[in-house]
Amino acid sequence: MSEISQYTEGLHEECGVFGIYDKTGETDMVSAVYSALYALQHRGQESCGIALNVDGVLSGHRDLGLVSEVFTKRVLEELPHGAKMATGHVRYATAGQRSRSNAQPMILHHCKGAMALCHNGNLVNAPKLRRKLEMSGSIFHGTSDTEVIAYLLTQNRLLTPNIEMAVSRTMDDIEGAYSLVIMTHTKLIAARDPHGFRPLCIGELPDGSGYAFASESCALDAVGAKFLRDVRPGEIVIADHTGLRSMDSHCGTAPHTICVFEYIYFARPDSVVEGTCVHEARLQAGRFLAQEHPVEADVVIGAPDSGLDAALGYAQESGIPYGIGFIKNKYVGRTFIQGSQKQRENSVRIKLNAIEATVKGKRVVLVDDSIVRGTTSARTIRLLREAGAKEVHYRISAPPFAHPCYFGTDIPDEKQLIATGHTVEEINKLVGSDTLGYLSIEHVQQLAIHSHCGFCTGCFTGRYPVDPPAETMDIVYDKPLSVSNPSKKL
């Protein structure tokens, strides 16, 4: 499998955002956000943070690490209590380096009041905006595109009568994927880009005492909030003492194209995204996969965790018995969202163990959600061979990843994708399976069972709803600023 090593570098991000407002002040905000971030931990494992609003004063804590590592009992006890509003964030970096300065929420202080900002997504015009802001005097402390949004918000707040108008004006400036939660001294605001690339939903607290915004509905469940609806693409939603209200000036300005990978991999199975339960969508993907790529076999198993639902769907459609083929070490993070390639390879070695009783001497259908680099796939198939599987037929509930993502998913460079420049048969040989079948793009586009939204499928097709950036933020970090008179000393 030595050929695979050249396709095992790259890939980056996903984030989770959360905000909660309780006009009565009876909700324990520290406990609520802590619980919500646990529910969203699968969306980012590099850093996390909580910001609280106590009597109009914003403060918080953020650091590198998992929620359980950053928010120890001591830290939780030292956070201010009595807040009526709070925000939280989990991060895995796509735009910006892995550092504490890039952790969120970002708390901003300016002459019209403080605000805390949480962002999920990627801006395609962040390099251009950052350079413009630096030329106007802005000093950046981190390397993420969220800081670009922060500076634009503070500038626009000086030019507008209220924060929601500043958010609207900022949305005029930024392009790409963004689901935002913003907290001021009196308001909690959610905003979503006009394409709706990343999910964002609204929940109501018990007894109608307030509202919550979250990347996924599972976080609403964690705090006992009732799911109301998704934030519409382009919508700004404001929660304050008057209730809930909406601004829709950016709604309908672009086609709705949520990232299809939310259904395939990122979102938790119990979450409802755009009206469709993620578990149900993955079951349907497995059924479609069985229709497209049937095979004679003895057992169907899934690659934990996001391949399990599709495997069950494949078994239901094909009539082949479903089995549990692997035991997963729950204390090793997901390989797809860990920082370096060496970390990923080490975690693959200790992450899974095949159950010999399920696969020995059998023809196995292994269902997985994707093949990105190929490292994990090859190792997983090798585990099945070592456990005695007679045949391994690999089935993928997504089309081949052959193109980078610019909107907040961990796929940055075509050179790092095994599907780039290789046929399906070549990939089959590289990962070591007997046969390989991918789900078609036509069936992928039917996974939003209970909604009429479209999908961004750029990582499969190379066709994007928004033009890709001409340069990345990584280039901007190292590029010196140009000035009109280079010889003049500043």
Segments from the language model and where they lie:
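Secondary-structure transition/capping motifs at alpha-helix termini
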Residues: 138, 159-160, 294-298, 316-323, ...
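Conserved short alpha-helical segments that host acidic/polar catalytic motifs at enzyme active sites
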Residues: 1-233, 238-297, 303, 391, ...
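Short, glycine/charge-rich flexible loops or terminal/linker lids adjacent to PRPP-binding catalytic cores
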Residues: 319-364, 375, 402-408, 412
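A conserved beta-strand->alpha-helix junction
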Residues: 142, 147-150, 322-333, 430-448
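Phosphate/diphosphate-binding loops
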Residues: 169, 218-219, 226, 234-235, ...
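PRPP-dependent phosphoribosyltransferase catalytic core
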Residues: 171, 186, 224-230, 251, ...
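Flexible loop/turn segments at secondary-structure boundaries
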Residues: 94-95, 125, 189, 197-198, ...
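Generic beta-strand/beta-sheet core signal
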Residues: 118, 183, 191-192, 203, ...
